[in-house]
Regions:
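Solenoidal tandem-repeat scaffolds enriched in leucines and small polar residues
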Residues: 173-197
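Helix N-cap motif at beta-to-alpha junctions
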Residues: 16-18, 75-80, 173-174, 263-267
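Conserved active-site tyrosine of GNAT-family acetyltransferases
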Residues: 21-26, 85, 150, 177-182, ...
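Conserved acetyl-CoA-binding loop of GNAT-fold acetyltransferases
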Residues: 27-34, 89-92, 183-189, 278-279
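Eukaryotic phosphotyrosine signaling hubs
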Residues: 68-70, 256-257
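Vicinal oxygen chelate
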Residues: 1, 86-169, 191-231, 238-242, ...
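Mature N-terminal segment immediately following signal peptide/propeptide cleavage
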Residues: 5-37
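Conserved beta-strand-loop-alpha-helix junction that forms the acyl-donor binding cleft
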Residues: 12-17, 168-174, 197-198
Length: 309
């Protein structure tokens, strides 16, 4: 009998001061609440999503790059959110470089919109946008702030309600990773994010797009193709190919330590994943008043399966 697909449970962060970190996020995203789960301090979002925290003695590393790039929220009005953040002295808003002679904006809708389904433009496409007087939309868009412990946090609008909505990943091969999540964990592919042509294990490895795009947190732009995505419930996992030439490292012990999915029958999942050759990082263990197991994803991301009956 097929196992019901997991749902997203939590993102797990390492922090020098979990209580201060949670307070920071509650002030920025006020539909969230400070809570506890499994004996750990936690942030609770209104869509039944948690961010759990472990206290660490030293700043949690954010490099070398792991498979987890950042996490983010939907907001009803991203431009109003930016203006609100501007007035808060403990918020550091991060510039998005536009690829236009060092120009930068705080929200993507203040520069040229993406094209061809990509959230950015190459320098050649920027030149074309200038030549044809393509205007910024000045509505919605995405931006970033620096969170506690050097976390990278995205806010994106305009959406019906504020909620935790995604964990953005890097993968060695995004389409292969998408297949892995579908095959082993029953992930869904969000509407509009299916590959342009059917992908198989024989065809999922594709080269990284040659051109960087803007806006981007890096002055030199970022590679946005190929792009893939999966989802568990209403939490999405979009992904790009890793940006540099160094292989991604494991997530354990880093700022973004792992993410967790809720399953109904842990023993059945352990048996299934074992039969499928999925790597176990930790055998089943107690987690609060339930049990969990830690597996490894296709780009060395640690994934916790939490039994929730």
């Amino acid at each position: 009998m097929p196992l019901p697909p997991p749902r997203f449970h939590h993102l797990h962060l390492n922090s020098r001061d979990p209580d201060a970190a949670i307070d920071f996020y509650v002030r920025r995203f006020p539909t969230s609440v400070k809570t506890r789960w499994g004996g750990r301090p936690a942030l609770g979002a209104p869509n039944d999503v948690l961010v759990l925290f472990d206290r660490v003695a030293t700043p949690p590393p954010t490099s070398p790059q792991t498979a987890i790039w950042h996490f983010g929220w939907h907001v009803p009005d991203s431009r109003r959110t930016v203006e609100s953040f501007r007035g808060q002295p403990d918020v550091e808003l991060l510039p998005l470089y536009t690829g236009d002679d060092g120009g930068a904006v705080l929200v993507s809708s203040d520069t040229w919109p993406g094209t061809g389904g990509v959230l950015g433009r190459t320098k050649a496409q920027i030149a074309e946008a200038k030549a044809t007087a393509v205007p910024p939309t000045r509505t919605g868009g995405f931006g970033y702030l620096r969170g506690p412990d050097d976390a990278l946090v995205e806010y994106a609008g305009n959406h019906p309600a504020e909620r935790f909505n995604h964990v953005h990943l890097y993968h060695e091969d995004p389409f292969c990773a998408q297949l892995w999540y579908q095959r082993h964990l029953g992930a869904q592919v969000p509407a509009g994010r299916t590959p342009p042509a059917p992908v198989t294990e024989a065809t999922c490895r594709v080269p990284r797009g040659p051109d960087r795009t803007f806006p981007a947190l890096d002055r030199d732009g970022m590679f946005r193709t190929p792009s893939a995505a999966v989802a568990f419930g209403d939490v999405a996992f979009p992904s790009y190919m890793r940006q540099g030439d160094r292989p991604l490292v494991g997530t354990r012990g880093h700022l973004y330590d792992h993410f967790a999915l809720a399953v109904g029958d842990l023993d059945a999942w352990v048996a299934r994943l074992g039969d499928e050759g999925v790597a176990l990082l930790e055998q089943p263990y107690r987690l609060g008043d339930t049990r969990a197991v830690m597996i490894e994803g296709p780009s060395r991301e640690a994934i916790e399966l939490v039994e929730v009956r």
